[in-house]
Amino acid sequence: MKRFIPLALIVPLAVAGCSSSSKTTPSSPTTAGGSTATTAAPATTTGGSSGGSANMNLGNPSSAQTINEAGSTLLYPFLQEIAPAFHTMYSNATLNPGPGGSGKGISDAIAGTAQLGGSDAYLSNSQRSSNPGLMNIPVAISSQAVNYNLPGVSGLKLSGDVIAQIYEGKITKWNDPAIAALNTGATLPATTIVPVRRVDASGDTFIFTSLLSATNSAWQSGPAFGTSVTWPAVSNELTANGNPGMVQTCQATPGCIAYVGISSEDAAQSAGLGEAMLQNKAGNFVLPNASTVEAAVSAGATSIPANLAAPIIYEPGAQSYPIVNFEYLVVKDKQSSADLAMAVRDFLAFAISPTGGSTPAFLAKEHFQGLPSSVVPQVETAIASISS
């Protein structure tokens, strides 16, 4: 079983932020929110904070504080795992994580009903301009699998272009010539394909449709990419809430195809779902694992935007996995009290620390990797800016 560990990584190119549905491809050189990209030197990492490149003013708050978090179902299991250890370190600070999808995480952070909004998608230009002080804080690196329910079929190979045609309703059978051409020698059934997609506003949808936009021009000029898009009308498509819902729906539906965040990989395997090998930019077929995710991030560039918004989609490289992303906690730079601001800083610093939330044990359980060390100083500076 594949386990992610923090490895040497290099920061990807800064690229465009997008709204709930964007026509700009994820490889655009414009940074989200119009920020100027800054160059960071490549550096190895053991997964998280370098411990002291910024004065984050950490410590146990003087009174009990609860940090409410809502959002990404991909990030949620990781936050659940590290919350008790965080409370052990800071007895007056408690993290209260909740799922709901990245769209809910961002909207709750904007509304102030949650101090932290978990999201697989970075903030769009309009979200940032409409909400001054709202920040992207990367806390880990994750990826996304494409799963399927075809008993007796293993090692299935798919491309972003073919997947786009499936979700457009242009490819409807698993033995379609376009799929067969990617799987020479394989016996594919004439089973009807049932595409499953998220019904909630989802960061998983954001990164999945980013790949489709990068590999299929019709998709780019049509649905494009975002946490919510206008999906093509496919008569037999199914919808689901969250990554658990995607796994359950696909398990119950022979012929299904579904995109599932990597933190639900174990659940997908337990459900008997296959995991497709995806064609990368070099033309090779790869599965998501520690080395292919590292290759994707390393194949990006060494520049990052000042607003820390950067996708890692369809990067070059022989072993690069094509759907990789930063996991974000969206936060306001001003909190309601000094103690709450300290608790929020404490948690964010803990989450990225290689002796805190980003230990190999925590990361591996969710198949995550720690932040590249070249990103950490900017992240720590952003954390340090949170005040009351």
Per-range role (PLM):
Residues 19-388:
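Flexible loop/hinge segments at secondary-structure junctions
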